[in-house]
């Protein structure tokens, strides 16, 4: 703060109304906190006054310059163990009091952009210089003129050239191509080169009589083993004949040799 302030602002926090009740049980105990710049002061707590407290508190603030004309007032409820609960706040200007010495109004409180009651505040500014209000009233006020020199003097306009008539040129838009007809879209090329039956032993669509004739033909198997080498493998051992090779590699078990019947002696000959 400067040593020679502009003056002293006397604030009277009178009363409030329509405050929301923040007390869980019983009536609330509200108080106000005022701030101007970096200076913060508060009122006394009105015990159990509820929604319409009355403080009638007077606070003084030193105003260093005319730029300090904004005040923020916050109303709290003093809960258990003096824990503060926000009721509402407002930001107001006392610039009118710095020009006319007095200002008294009701101000609306808000809490998260919702209505939280009204607060009655009075301002009185006491300047350090006794001629402060005379100087403030004698200051020239710049008013916006109703007419200016620029508005009275017309701006010269350049002569406009005569416009040439425009020729209308016909514009031709190409038509979209005609879609193919359904017959052309579904048609199948009938070229003989696409379907050849020369390499096929049977036609693609045989008749039932042709199928019966084809599958009922007699199949003759050659007796020569060498003609069907894929059916019977050649013997790996050249000493074995084909009959021996087939006997050894047959899926059936081999036939046992016949038993030899030897002559046996009778019991009379043995114990003779």
UniProtKB/Swiss-Prot annotation:
Composition-biased stretches (Basic residues): 158-170
GO cellular component: cell cortex of cell tip; cell division site; cell tip; mitotic actomyosin contractile ring; mitotic actomyosin contractile ring, intermediate layer; nucleus
GO-annotated biological processes: actin cortical patch localization; establishment or maintenance of bipolar cell polarity; mitotic actomyosin contractile ring assembly; mitotic actomyosin contractile ring contraction; mitotic cytokinesis
InterPro entries named among the record's database cross-references: C2_dom (IPR000008), C2_domain_sf (IPR035892), C2_fungal_Inn1 (IPR037791), Ingression_C2_domain (IPR052981)
Pfam families in the record: C2
Spans annotated as Disordered: 155-187
Location relative to the cell: Cytoplasm; Nucleus
Domain C2: 1-107
Main localization (coarse): cytoplasm
Record key words, sorted: Cell cycle, Cell division, Cytoplasm, Mitosis, Nucleus
Taxonomic superkingdom: Eukaryota
PROSITE patterns tied to this protein: C2
Entry's family note: Belongs to the INN1/fic1 family.
PANTHER family, A to Z: CONSERVED SERINE PROLINE-RICH PROTEIN (AFU_ORTHOLOGUE AFUA_2G01790) (PTHR47052), INGRESSION PROTEIN 1 (PTHR47052:SF3)
Assembly and oligomerization: Interacts with cdc15 and imp2.
The protein, known as: Ingression protein fic1
Organism: Schizosaccharomyces pombe (strain 972 / ATCC 24843)
Species lineage: Eukaryota, Fungi, Dikarya, Ascomycota, Taphrinomycotina
Gene: fic1
